[in-house]
Amino acid sequence: MVKRRSWLGLALALPLVPGIARAQGTVVVFAAASLKNALDEIAAAWSKDTGKPTPKISYAASSALAKQIEQGAPADLFLSADLDWMDYVTGKNLIKPPSRFNLLGNKIVLIAPADSRTATLAINGGELAKALAGGRLSMANVDSVPVGKYGKAALQKLGAWNDVKDHLAQAENVRAALLLVARGEAPLGIVYSTDAAAEPKVRIVAAFPEDSHPPIIYPAALTKDSSSSDAKTFLDFLRSAKARGSFEKQGFTVLVRSASAT
C-alpha cells in the first residue's frame, strides 16, 4: 500500500508528466515523449475502430515513467525509448515478460534553428565547439534519458564529448531539448530524427553514424498490474498495418511484422 500511495508524490515532482488517474474502462499508456505524434494518431484510430475510449497517454522521459511505474502509478502499457529502462522495470517484476517486444527503431541527429547560419557540420570536437560559439548544446539528461544517453555515447565515440561536456543545456526529455533549439535558446541540439522532422523551426545539420551509439530500440510491454483486456488489444494494434503507417509517416523504423488489427 505504501508504494501505491507514494507514486502521486513522485508524479507531482515531475511536472512534464500529465495527470494519470485511470478512468473507468480507459487504457492508460506510459510512453516516451518522442512517440507523441505517432501514438496520438494511433490511439485515435484504435478508438475509432473498436468503439473504445481513446487511451489516456502520459508522455515523458522513459526514465521518469519507469520510476513512476516502480512507485505504483496505474499504467497498463509502457513504451520505452531504450532497452535499459524496460530492463529496469522487468528486473523489478513490473511488466508481463511474455507481452514484451521490440517495436521501433530511430536515429539521432544534430539540429540548429531553422534560420541559423550554421552549415552542415562534421561531428568532431573542434568543429562542434566552434559552432556553439559560446552557446550551449541542448540535450536531454545525459545520465538518465535515453536520447541523452545515446547522444553522449555518440559524442564520446566521435571524440567530441570532452569539448562540449561543460557546455550543455540539459532538458527533462527530448521534446524539451527540441524546444530550446526551436526557440533559438540553444544554437545546437541532439534529438531523434523523428522529432526534428516534426518541428519546422529546426533543421538537421548532421546525422550521427549508427555505429557511434547503442542501437536505438523502443520496446513495449504490458505492466504486471494491468488487468485490462483492452490494453492487450491496444498493444496488439501497435503491430497492425495501420499503426505501421503512422509510425513510418513520423520516420520511425518498425521492427515487427504487421499483424491483423483486432
Enumerate the predicted regions with their spans:
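Exported/periplasmic ABC-transporter solute-binding proteins
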Residues: 22-73, 80-83, 87-262
